[in-house]
């Protein structure tokens, strides 16, 4: 592995590890709850905004889609991870720094969720946001990494005047 890509690789492992540890902590804490306590581990309410930590499981892709296709979905996810990792490895030197950061975030999130599927057979979600009656589907840090990485990549592609510098 070239030394230039080592920080990216270490960041990828660090982010995936943070995701796995956060899920482990939530699962361990939820096992300590008594059957008579509330289902959430933490709550913060500010006006009409609320943030809760509630463990839940997702057997499908985003929003539980394709839950009935577990094996094809896992194969697809692994292929996407391998494809992105290969692309990042081959094109590393020519990629714009923002593109490398975005792809690293996306890969870290994908690794975090695939690790869950391999370990538990489903993804552990635990972050829940709501505002008034609007409720966002529960998610985890891996999902946040994927979303932030995707937004960074789209923003960079959109605002980069020289598109050649992105890829």
UniProtKB/Swiss-Prot annotation:
One of its GO terms (cellular component) is plasma membrane. The active site is at 125, 143. GO terms for biological process: proteolysis. Its EC number is 3.4.23.36. It is found in: Cell inner membrane. Its main location: membrane. It is a multi-pass membrane protein. It catalyses: Release of signal peptides from bacterial membrane prolipoproteins. Hydrolyzes -Xaa-Yaa-Zaa-|-(S,diacylglyceryl)Cys-, in which Xaa is hydrophobic (preferably Leu), and Yaa (Ala or Ser) and Zaa (Gly or Ala) have small, neutral side chains. GO terms for molecular function: aspartic-type endopeptidase activity. Pathway: Protein modification; lipoprotein biosynthesis (signal peptide cleavage). Keywords: Aspartyl protease, Cell inner membrane, Cell membrane, Hydrolase, Membrane, Protease, Transmembrane, Transmembrane helix. It comes from the Bacteria. It is an enzyme of class 3 (hydrolase). This protein specifically catalyzes the removal of signal peptides from prolipoproteins. Belongs to the peptidase A8 family. This is Lipoprotein signal peptidase. It comes from Chlamydia trachomatis serovar L2b (strain UCH-1/proctitis).
């Amino acid at each position: 592995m070239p030394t230039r890509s080592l920080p990216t690789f270490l960041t990828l492992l660090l982010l995936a590890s943070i995701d796995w540890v956060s899920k482990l902590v939530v699962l361990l804490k939820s096992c300590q709850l008594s059957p008579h306590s509330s289902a959430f581990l933490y709550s913060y309410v500010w006006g009409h905004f609320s943030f809760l930590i509630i463990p839940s499981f997702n057997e499908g892709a985003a929003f539980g889609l394709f839950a009935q296709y577990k094996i094809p979905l896992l194969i697809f996810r692994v292929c996407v991870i391998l494809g992105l990792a290969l692309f990042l490895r081959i094109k590393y030197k020519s990629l714009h720094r923002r593109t490398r950061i975005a792809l690293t975030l996306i890969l870290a999130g994908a690794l975090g969720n695939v690790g869950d599927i391999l370990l538990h057979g489903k993804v552990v979600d635990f972050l829940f946001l709501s505002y008034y009656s609007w409720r966002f589907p529960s998610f985890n840090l891996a999902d946040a990494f994927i979303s932030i990485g995707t937004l960074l990549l789209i923003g960079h592609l959109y605002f980069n005047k020289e598109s050649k510098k992105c890829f």
